[in-house]
Amino acid sequence: MKRFFFLPLFSVFVLAVSAQSKVGTLSFIPKVGVNLSNVSGNDIMFAVQQNAVNASPKYKAGFAGGAEFEYQLQPQYGLSLGVLYSLQGCRYKDISDAIAGKAGQYTGYSNMAMNLHYVQIPLLFSGYVGPGLAIKAGLQAGFLLEGKTKYDKTKFIVNRDGGIVYGTPYPVSIDIKPTFHTFDMAIPLGISYEYGHVVMDARYNFPLTKAEKEIGSKNKCFTFSVGYKFEILR
């Protein structure tokens, strides 16, 4: 009876080890994915005709991609180093300085988003807890390449009868890189699952440094990616 009890446990352990690369294997993992990012505390305010309006940041989606090298230290432990591109930032709801019930000329702001382009270098330790299933933690350095806030600005008139006449929207792009720190540090924590050579990864970057120089806001970012593992050295 004990033999039959321990046999499934032994089989699970063997599968957990065999799902990973052999000790001493160096693997190359190109990957693509999507970010869900935000910039905490980065409210935007517009003051037009003595009427101030503001908007709070919300999560937005962005592209993520790059590659990682992973070295299998032990049957259930690995170490990886990567270079990733990450489009982060935040978005805002559409706002205007219109006063309810009052006719006049106003300004509207739509499609507003902050785009921060980073190159990131994550160093991660992987602990395999099941067949192909790993928990990851480490340190990540980020370097800001470009930062812009973009939106469409539209003048419109509210008539006394409540009718609205819109003008032609025109795009606005503001360079915000000088107001941000060019270096960023974070602690990535995540989980990955490998099936065959396909690696699915989800992680969150806990910020260690401030994103902006004066406000003290921080980057908040979830990353979901899919990659393919090539064993290049055994």
Task: Set out the residue ranges of the language-model regions.
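Short glycine/proline- and aromatic-enriched beta-strand/turn motifs that initiate or cap beta-hairpins
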Residues: 20-70, 231
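Extracellular/periplasm-exposed beta-strand and loop segments of Gram-negative cell-envelope proteins
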Residues: 38-60, 87-117, 144-184, 188, ...
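Structural signature of outer-membrane beta-barrel domains
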Residues: 35-39, 86-90, 142-146, 205-209, ...
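Residues on the lipid-exposed face of transmembrane beta-strands in outer-membrane beta-barrel proteins
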Residues: 30-34, 63-71, 83-85, 121-129, ...
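Outer-membrane beta-barrel channels and translocator barrels
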Residues: 23, 74-76, 130, 195-198, ...
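Bacterial Sec-dependent N-terminal signal peptides
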Residues: 1-31, 226-232
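Predominantly the C-terminal beta-signal and adjacent terminal strand-loop region
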Residues: 170-234
